[in-house]
């Protein structure tokens, strides 16, 4: 990672604090993972306060695959089985079956419809019957041990929203360049300046846990 590029956002602890404040205010953040892993940057929003305009931004500048990151307990409550019985993907990304709200939407594709689906899924009293399967929102089940057990964007989204005092559920979407390639750190930082989103890396969250503990 180019630490010089990140330095304008503060040290690791400050970068996490900035991210938590942004999530509390209802704004998005940008999280990069290790360059030896996916080496990609994701937009992350807190599921409970994400807006239609923010969803439109994620769809327009992201991969189009919008995921909601949930705890294992929430996935169990919603009866969301894993997408496949044997996960042989490179990073064992824990996709469940895709979902759609059972009410209040049309085709489920629009930014508005996807927000309705997300709000439906994270309701405190949400039931399995509140969601249709398959759909256009892709749940990801976070590792129960969080970022300290699996250093992925899924765990970052759940851990950061929890640390921010919000429901432990985040919406993520990978950022892409105009030519269809994946955005790396230089492009992510340019994107952050344009849309006023703080930047941090996965390792910052691990350092933050060490700091507060």
UniProtKB/Swiss-Prot annotation:
Name the coenzymes or cofactors required. Answer: Mg(2+); Mn(2+)
Q: Which InterPro entries match?
A: DHBP_synth_RibB-like_a/b_dom, DHBP_synthase_RibB
Residues reported to bind Mg(2+) 2:
38, 153
Q: How does it assemble?
A: Homodimer.
Q: Which gene encodes it?
A: ribB
What EC number(s) are associated with this protein in UniProt? 4.1.99.12
Q: Which SUPFAM superfamilies match?
A: YrdC/RibB
Q: Name one GO biological process term.
A: riboflavin biosynthetic process
Q: In which pathway does it act?
A: Cofactor biosynthesis; riboflavin biosynthesis; 2-hydroxy-3-oxobutyl phosphate from D-ribulose 5-phosphate: step 1/1
Alphabetically, the GO molecular function entries are: 3,4-dihydroxy-2-butanone-4-phosphate synthase activity; magnesium ion binding; manganese ion binding
What are the residue positions of the site described as Essential for catalytic activity? 136, 174
- What name does UniProt use for this protein? 3,4-dihydroxy-2-butanone 4-phosphate synthase
User: Which parts of the sequence bind Mg(2+) 1?
Assistant: 38
What does the entry list as the binding residues for D-ribulose 5-phosphate?
A: 37-38, 42, 150-154, 174
The free-text cofactor remark is: Binds 2 divalent metal cations per subunit. Magnesium or manganese.
The catalytic activity, as recorded, is:
D-ribulose 5-phosphate = (2S)-2-hydroxy-3-oxobutyl phosphate + formate + H(+)
Q: Report keywords, A-Z.
A: Lyase, Magnesium, Manganese, Metal-binding, Riboflavin biosynthesis
């Amino acid at each position: 990672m180019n630490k010089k590029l990140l330095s304008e956002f503060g040290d690791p602890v400050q970068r996490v604090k900035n991210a938590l404040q942004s999530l509390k205010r209802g704004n998005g953040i940008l999280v990069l993972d290790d360059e030896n892993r996916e080496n990609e940057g994701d937009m992350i929003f807190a599921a409970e306060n994400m807006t239609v305009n923010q969803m439109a931004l994620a769809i327009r500048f992201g991969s189009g695959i919008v995921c909601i990151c949930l705890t294992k307990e929430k996935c169990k409550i919603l009866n969301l089985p894993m997408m496949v019985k044997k996960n042989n993907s490179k990073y064992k990304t824990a996709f469940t079956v895709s979902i759609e709200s059972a009410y209040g939407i049309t085709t489920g594709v629009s930014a508005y419809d996807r927000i309705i689906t997300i709000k439906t899924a994270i309701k405190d009293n949400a039931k399995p019957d509140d969601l249709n399967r398959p759909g256009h929102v892709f749940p990801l089940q976070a590792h129960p041990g969080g970022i300290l057990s699996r250093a992925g964007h899924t765990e970052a989204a759940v851990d950061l929203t929890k640390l921010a005092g919000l429901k432990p559920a985040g919406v993520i979407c990978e950022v892409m360049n105009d030519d269809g390639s994946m955005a790396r750190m230089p492009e992510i930082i340019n994107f952050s300046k344009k849309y006023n989103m703080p930047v941090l890396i996965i390792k910052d969250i691990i350092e933050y846990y060490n700091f507060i503990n």
